[in-house]
């Protein structure tokens, strides 16, 4: 067989990942001395300190993605109906922007003229409908757990520039951290790639 007729194969493991609460033999620790077994548990997510404040009085309905989209629409249109959630969202956006500014200053990327502001971030969240640019999952603007993988973040398209208008996309924290320095369109392609299994 010549080079041009060679078939290249890619092996892909299509075994579905375990869901929370599922175990296999590797997760069970038999304690022969006491005649029982214990199942290793995943660590319990740590609650953010802000959830203990009086201002954090949200029901599970308030934290649903559809409600969070509604709050962003209210902030974007400047017709605020749900005053408390919108106020907390604005405070959190400001805190994140201050963190991004500190990162940019430290790296020498800060440009006060171009740096993203509150209005710009709200517009981006509204335009993205609170979806991650890469994985297309819903991002959370209100979240209870520390290091919540689906919390919203601003990912820089070009990592040699700051968190500037025109250089940002809305991304979940998981995708933002995973992408690192990979070209943004290439990373988006890998996140949206669908592998079809043929029989």
Which sequence ranges carry the predicted segments?
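Short beta-strand-alpha-helix junction that forms the catalytic/metal-binding core
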Residues: 129, 159-178
């Amino acid at each position: 067989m010549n080079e041009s007729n060679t078939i290249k194969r890619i092996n892909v493991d299509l075994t579905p990942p375990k869901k929370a609460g599922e175990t296999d033999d590797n997760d069970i620790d038999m304690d022969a001395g006491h005649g029982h077994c214990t199942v290793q548990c995943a660590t319990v997510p740590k609650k953010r300190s802000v959830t203990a404040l009086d201002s954090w009085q949200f029901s599970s309905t308030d934290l649903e993605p559809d409600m969070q989209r509604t709050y962003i629409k209210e902030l974007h249109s400047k017709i605020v109906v749900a005053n408390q959630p919108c106020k907390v969202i604005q405070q959190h956006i400001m805190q994140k922007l201050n963190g991004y500014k500190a990162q940019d200053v430290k790296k020498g990327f800060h440009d006060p003229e171009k740096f993203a502001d509150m209005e710009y971030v709200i517009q981006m969240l509204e335009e993205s409908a609170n979806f991650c640019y890469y994985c297309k999952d819903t991002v959370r603007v209100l979240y209870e757990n520390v290091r919540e993988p689906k919390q919203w973040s601003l990912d820089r398209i070009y990592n040699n520039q700051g968190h500037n208008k025109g250089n940002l996309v809305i991304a979940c924290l998981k995708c933002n951290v995973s992408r690192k320095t990979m070209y943004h369109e290439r990373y988006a392609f890998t996140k949206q790639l669908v592998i079809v299994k043929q029989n």
